């Protein structure tokens, strides 16, 4: 499992939630860092922030799908933007969660997407 967000607080909070649920994970502060390590870490599920400096989460998602990454990718954002959600879905995202609801939905996300992997 991987967490990709430029905000270390989100990495820490989501990481703690996953640790509490006995889910091993890696955290990355950029899309480039994830893509550079994807073959080593081989996560079954990626929590991917949409808006990050450098390569955006959306561009990262496109790279992952072009590289035939078969795991689930759940995008998250502070923005409740229907157009961005549609773009993410078209690019191959498995889900979309608002950051405000992310921590409440972690168990549901794990049940839904880890069983599909």
What are these regions (language model features)?
Residues 83, 101-111:
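C-terminal output helix
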Residues 59, 80-97:
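Alpha4 helix (beta4-alpha4-beta5 surface) of REC/receiver domains from two-component response regulators
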Residues 52:
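Receiver (REC) domain active-site loop signature in two-component systems and cognate sites
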Residues 41-47:
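Active-site beta3 strand of CheY-like receiver
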Residues 36, 58-69:
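Short amphipathic alpha-helix used as the core "switch/output" element in two-component signaling
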Residues 29-30, 56-59:
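Acidic catalytic/metal-coordinating carboxylates
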